[in-house]
A protein has these predicted regions:
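Flexible, glycine/threonine- and acidic-rich loop/arm segments that mediate assembly and lattice contacts
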Residues: 1-302
Length: 302
């Protein structure tokens, strides 16, 4: 039995991990006032004071419950199936793999947070693209914390890519200097084209490589620019719509891993339910949400 599907979950893997203690969790954001060097007159008394917490704000997100079910009839478990040693265990393992993909796609989506309001309207966690303002800025994110580094013009060139890095640096100073770009397949290919120069009917490369290996490497997995270093990881779970297999190949999340976290209320678990006569059945579940500590720490392409 062979199952060959995309399963890499780079965003969840690199994000910080935290514990949620309720259905809604919050972080605080603040800013610094603009640099001022007007000076102070000699002998001038201090008569005015600033409230340094005036701009402080709380931004938060809901958890979301994820679940995958599985069941195996009595006969299906008893008969020999080619390539499957245990039908119930195989079904359970498949559900776990699907659950991981569900969560990755949710936190990399543009869905907004939602409180549970009854049947058909469950808790939903805000996805990273929505945190960064795709489809409109979230109402709880103050202006000073909103994302400003992005490009939605289409095909990426080195100039447009560097412009986003410059915007990010100007917004937050790039304190870590180490970014990760989770890139759709088309965006990943466009970045690899940065080393190419247009000429004639095709592209010309200018590379110097040792000939002993008898191979040519034409890929970009680490980009070092004027405004930081970017590790580039491909993904097919960016900006997805729930239940759709459509891949947004041009999408990309430019993430500073220090400023995102997964808050888990219930860790991934598997449960077997009572066999009511028809066969063994069960489910795997996860309850967690995405915290973005500061939207302007990140960028996106779309």
């Amino acid at each position: 039995l062979t199952i060959l599907e995309p399963e890499s979950t780079p965003f969840v893997s690199m994000a910080n991990k935290a514990t949620a203690s309720g259905t809604f969790f919050e972080v605080q954001v603040d800013d610094l006032s603009t640099a001022n060097f007007d000076g102070v007159n000699e002998g001038e008394d201090v008569t005015a004071f600033d409230n340094k917490a005036a701009n402080r704000a709380r931004i938060g997100n809901y958890i979301q419950s994820f679940r995958r079910t599985f069941a195996v009839s009595n006969i299906a478990e008893l008969v020999d199936t080619a390539g499957v040693a245990n039908e119930f265990s195989a079904s359970e393992a498949k559900a776990v793999r699907e659950l991981k993909r569900d969560f990755e796609a949710a936190v990399c989506s543009a869905q907004d947070r939602q409180a549970d309001s009854g049947a058909g309207a469950p808790y939903k966690t805000r996805g990273m693209f929505k945190w960064l303002g795709v489809g409109g800025q979230p109402s709880d994110v103050p202006t000073f914390a909103q994302n400003v580094a992005n490009d939605t013009t289409g095909t990426q060139t080195e100039a447009t890519f560097n412009s986003v890095l410059q915007e990010l640096y100007e917004a937050n100073g790039m304190p870590g200097g180490q970014l990760t770009l989770i890139a759709g397949p088309q965006l990943k290919k466009e970045i690899s084209d940065f080393a190419r120069q247009a000429g004639g009917a095709g592209f010309a490369f200018s590379v110097t490589q040792p000939a002993e290996s008898k191979k040519i490497t034409l890929t970009v997995n680490l980009y070092e620019g004027d405004f930081g270093t970017v590790a580039i990881v491909p993904s097919v779970f960016l900006n997805r719509t729930s239940g759709s297999s459509t891949i947004d190949g041009d999408a990309g999340l430019l993430i500073d891993p220090e400023y995102v976290a997964i808050h888990t209320l219930q860790a991934e678990s598997n449960s077997e339910l009572e066999n009511q006569g028809g066969g063994r059945r069960g489910f795997c579940s996860l309850i967690a949400g995405l915290a973005c500590h500061m939207p302007k720490a990140h960028g996106f392409f779309n």
